[in-house]
């Protein structure tokens, strides 16, 4: 039963849900945006160039979790690192929402850095909630994992719809707003 779990699980659940909404929402439209023609608001990259950029981006996100964990352990602590990561992700998505090619790679880089800070540490915070409740840890992580699935579904629908039907930058903007909701919810 959810009521038996620590109250902080709810905060971490919704923070992760909004972060995953922003992450998967942006990822869902990224290659489409890069390969769309300039007349359609895209970057007019070839499929191979867009796929290469996407692959480098995806790999960088996962590699960034290593320094993100180190930064939390040695500099700021997990709670502050999650907050800083969320703010950086939000700005990365909002920069992607600006129709300016020169800002494109900067926005992607911010999302990589922010995700590297947030992702490993929010999971560690969930684990820390159950230091004295080992028997509940598995169900706590199951509940937390549902936030990832829920956020990804929201992201694909919201950012995907806006990106393909209204404009790519609206999809990226929605990802930024989603992360803003996550940051606000985390600090309240």
Feature locations, PLM:
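Cytosolic juxtamembrane N-terminal segment immediately preceding the first transmembrane helix
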Residues: 1-24, 29
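Short amphipathic helix-loop junctions that connect adjacent transmembrane helices
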Residues: 28-49
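Interfacial helix-cap and linker-helix signal at transmembrane-aqueous boundaries
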Residues: 34-35, 71-73, 158-167
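Central cavity-lining transmembrane alpha-helices of secondary-active solute carriers
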Residues: 51-73, 119, 153
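Glycine-rich segments within core transmembrane alpha-helices of 12-TM secondary carriers
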Residues: 61, 136-164, 170-182, 186
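Cytoplasmic membrane-interface "Motif A"-like loop-to-helix N-cap segments
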Residues: 74-86, 133
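C-terminal ends and interior cores of transmembrane alpha-helices
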Residues: 84-105
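Intracellular juxtamembrane helix-capping segments at the cytosolic ends
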Residues: 117-131
